[in-house]
Amino acid sequence: MDSHPSLMGRSITNSNRSSLDLGRPSSSSSSSPSPLTKSISDASSQSLSSILNNPHGGKSGVYGSDASWVGWWSSSTFVAPAEFAPVASTKLPGSELTRSDFHGYVSSISESHGRFEDIRKHTREESCGFDQESHVSGLAACLREVPSLYFKEDFALEDGATFRSACPFSSLNENLALQEKLSQYLDVVELHLVKEISVRSDSFFEAQGQLQDLNVKIVEGCSRIRELKETIRLLDRNLVDSARQIQELSSTRINMLELQRKLRLILYVNQALSALKLLVASADCAGALDITDDLQNLLAGDELTGLYCFRHLRDHVTSSIDSINSILTSEFMRISIHDTGEIDVLILSAANIRGSISSNGNTGEEVKLEEEDTSTLCDRLLPLVIGLLRTAKFPSILRMYRDTLTSEMKNAIKKAVADLLPILVARSLESDFSHGERSVDDGGGLSLASKLRTLSSEAFVNLLTAIFKIVQAHLVRASEVKKAIEWILCNIDGHYAADSVAAAIAVGAVAAETAQEIGFQGGSLVSSPLGKATSKAPPLQGKSSDASSLMNMSRNFRADVLRENTEAVFAACEVTHGRWAKLLGVRALLHPKLKLQEFMSIYDLTQEFITSTEKIGGRLGSSIRGTLQSQAKAFVDSQHESRMTKLKAVLDQETWDEIDVPEEFQSIISSLFASQRLISGKVDDADLNSYHSNRLPLNGSLTSGSGDQNSELRNEKSESSEGSVVSDAQVKPTVSPESLERSKAGVSSATNNQSNQKAHGKSNLFYQGVGYHMVNCGLILLKMLSEYIDMNNSLPALSSEIVLRVVEVLRFFNTRTCQLVLGAGAMQVSGLKSIKAKHLALASQVIDFTYTIIPETRRILFSKVPETRKPLLSVEIDKVAQDFRIHRDEIYTKLVQIMRERLLAHLHGLPKVVEGWNRPPDTNKQTKEFAWPLTREVGYLHRVLSETLHEADVQAIFRQVISIIHTQTSQTLTNLEISSTEAKKRLKLHVELILKCIRSLPSDNANQSDIPNWGQLDEFFAEHFREEEAGEAE
């Protein structure tokens, strides 16, 4: 109402003269603001050209040609606009435009123009509505004629700027005109005010009449209210007062009864507190818990609300429950743990008196409580468990019990070590002094670890045995406590207190759940007795649709207690495992150097300890098992290293001479391979293929014929192993290992072997019915294999490692033997002058024996090896066995090669011998030039091999030797040029002697009328000498 007149007034002031000149009525200028008027108020944001170029401009409105656009920029101060004549438009020639020129423009703005027309139509309809209301707002319309300056809120002529705007200093005539204009403004305002008042006078008087009618009605309503109040007062006095008095008396009676109940409750609580103190002082925990249940039930409700005298009741109950928990906890700890102290004293006393508990690692009878003691333990623990369950403190008490139990175990072990160690150290030193090993030292200045290291293995086993018994006593007690708690909680055998236990579990479950919900992290629990559990039942049922929620909480609470109960025993077992492992770790450097029996006594005792504790604890002890496994592996590695060193030294000192086999080693074969049928040293003569009747009286050795022969043999032995392989490849097709093995079955050694056995005792080592001649290193290897088998049986967990070590030992033995014998290394390390056929034969016997026992050794070792490791280990053992077989065949090939070289040496000198046969015959030297040395060496080789090798091996070797003699001799004799008869006779004698020697050699080759060892030399003899014999006979 205030803003419109100033705006309209400014508009009227600026366009007043133009409106009067154009003769427009004042009503048109007083109409409501049109969109054009709104655009005037925002003239600063409009384009001036768009206003002046409005196509709808005419002689009406502000867009008339005589209207100035200066009014659009008018301010509150009236400024007379300047009058400008319209610009005359001049048409230029050729600027005539037609409608068709605007078709493109019209088509482009047709859509926008349509929207514009719709908007203008809507605006026109709104303008018509404003015109209908214009006569109602006449005052606002007339005020437009007065400048807006006079309607400002801060209008004051005292203000210089306002005065200068309203009354500018000018001439006298202008001042008179200004006074006339101001009077005119005042008249206009007064006139329209009167009009407005007259227009609104009817409504004023109508409203005044309505107010008078309202006043009359209010007076009537007040009178009616006074009448109603009087009526109500009379009704109260006559009808309600007596009933109200009765109600007040009844209320007083109820209040008095409630007061009496409160007083009795106060009396009960006071007496309960007194009784609670007495029960706690007398350690009657069950009765005290009943009272705390009632008191906490009262505290959980609102009966004691507002009683200032019981403001500390909750604290009293809390302290009482703490006291009850302390009593129950101490009694539980005393029954569960401290009763084992007497057993420790008895065990230590017995150990001190006897000095050794059990030297073989046997801990004696298993510690076990009697049935009566177990029943008594359950009866003693039952009230304590029920009480701790009711207070919901049993899980935390069991955790405390676990910590206390582990601490007691540590202290018991520490005390046992402290008491027994000085005694055992002194006895160990005395024992060492009595054996002259070292001087006596009391060990007073040594540390505990040093004292443990000074103990002998037997003393250390005694110490471990004492600790085992003490630990077993504690763990058995803990196990019985665990079983008793399980018996109580799980209602085993339906014991008499099952209902009480179930109620206590329910109370404890609710208490634990409540404590968890309200955020208790420790301290006393004061909000969950049996009464409260009963009162809490409706909310619990509200949380779950049935009683399953309470059952689930009870089940979970019981599970928590049982878990903590199990964890306590397992933690005690873990502590004992750690202490035991620490004791073993102190002596970790000593145990690998022990003997097998000493180490196994510690190992077996530890295994028994682990088994016993794991049985009690119910879980595997990974830490102590790892410690024991690492020490066992270190023991195996140390034993293997020492045996490898010993085996290398034995091989380097080996002279490759045959030795008698002590009964100890035959017993090793009998005990290790008992499943095989062993034969004794007796040999049936009928089963032997003897050739002693045809043997020549040969003397000397194979390598003692001449210096050239010895040098040749040494050169052969000093060749590398590659030469052996080559020669083996050349001869191996004629010597089949399979045929050798088939020929060995059921065959014993030669007759000379039997005679040596009678003279010197048992000279052969028998296995599977076959006797083997042995040297020192072979027996040492057998002893080592038996020790590895013992380790394998004693340490089955390391069976795979032991098998690998056995493979390494066998491979080293085979390689080193090949270097010493075939490679002639023994001539440097052992001082041998030469490698004789006897050495080769004995080496082959040792290699053959080892190769023969490998399958049975593998079977025994693999009995402990896991199935997953067997394929890989089988491949390794098969490779080693193959190496042994190849080595044996190379030795046989070397023996054949030696005989071949000796034959070629004799044949090489035969032409010179033939040249001397033209001289007169000398009967004493007829055969000593060629045949006699050759047959002598062949006979020596036959004798040596027959005494050492098996008959099948001898036959296989001499089959090749005979073949070589036949081939080489016949070829050489064929190429000889013999011109005289005497030379032919001598040659015949030599050939007959060689054939006689060949006939006496063992061989499985028989041809042409069953003549033994028939060959090319026989054919040569028949071809050259049988015809002559036939001619002479004729």
Swiss-Prot record:
Alphabetical keyword list: Chloroplast, Coiled coil, Golgi apparatus, Membrane, Plastid, Protein transport, Transit peptide, Transport
Gene deletion effect: Lethal when homozygous. In hemizygous plants, male-specific transmission defect.
GO CC term (a single one): GARP complex
Tissue: Present in pollen. Mostly expressed in roots and flower buds, and, at lower levels, in vegetative tissues and mature flowers.
Compositionally skewed regions (Polar residues) per UniProt: 700-710, 746-758
Gene3D superfamilies reported in the protein's UniProt record: 6.10.250.860
GO biological process: protein transport; retrograde transport, endosome to Golgi
Membrane association type: Peripheral membrane protein
Coiled coil: 224-264
Transit peptide region: 1-87
Superkingdom of source: Eukaryota
Principal place of residence: Golgi
Biased composition (Basic and acidic residues): 711-720
Localization terms from the record: Golgi apparatus membrane; Golgi apparatus, trans-Golgi network membrane; Plastid, Chloroplast
Keyword Transport among record annotations: yes
Composition skew (Low complexity), residue ranges: 18-42
Record function comment: Acts as a component of the GARP complex that is involved in retrograde transport from early and late endosomes to the trans-Golgi network (TGN). The GARP complex facilitates tethering as well as SNARE complex assembly at the Golgi. Probably involved in pollen tube elongation and other polar growth.
Family per similarity comment: Belongs to the VPS54 family.
Quaternary state and interactors: Component of the Golgi-associated retrograde protein (GARP) complex, composed by VPS52, VPS53 and VPS54. Interacts directly with VPS53.
Descriptive protein name: Vacuolar protein sorting-associated protein 54, chloroplastic
The species this protein was found in: Arabidopsis thaliana
Lineage, opening ranks: Eukaryota, Viridiplantae, Streptophyta, Embryophyta, Tracheophyta
Gene: VPS54
